[in-house]
Amino acid sequence: MSLVRLLILIVLLSAASLRAESPAEQAVLAAIKSPQLTVVHLWAPWCSNCLAELKTGGWTKIVNENPQVKFYLVSIWNDGQDGRAMLNKFGITAQPNVTILADPGPRRGENKIKQLAGLPLSWIPATWIYKGGDLRYALNYGEVRFPVLQQFLTDSQSEWSHKGEPSIE
């Protein structure tokens, strides 16, 4: 009987390690709990939509014009590479309110990341705005329009929250 228990324990530990959070995800999870406004941008240097966003200068401008906001640029599906060289071309890496991270996973295959911080990932770029642990906005499946992102950042400075509201169920 003890051999069966040992095998069950090994299987359970193996399953738990498969779902372990990467250092990048751990950093994001810690950051989004902050009371300050936090933007998590998921991207990859090989992604044409991500490059289009960078080439417009929108990210550089939004980072510079919002020094009170923390930006986490997380390269995903890029075999653990953070894309820092690409971001450096656009003057983003030297900004004090920017943290550059990389998920260690590959672009394809069963080890490709499918969620981050509890949210599904199926397309990049994706941009999430948090304040005090609350997801304020999620812009998924394509390029962000920077005037819209700026409006969302402005709106997110308010103190509104859905906590304490009655359930609709």
Regions found by a protein language model. Give the residues of each.
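Structural microenvironment flanking redox-active thiols in thiol-disulfide oxidoreductases
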Residues: 51-92, 106-112
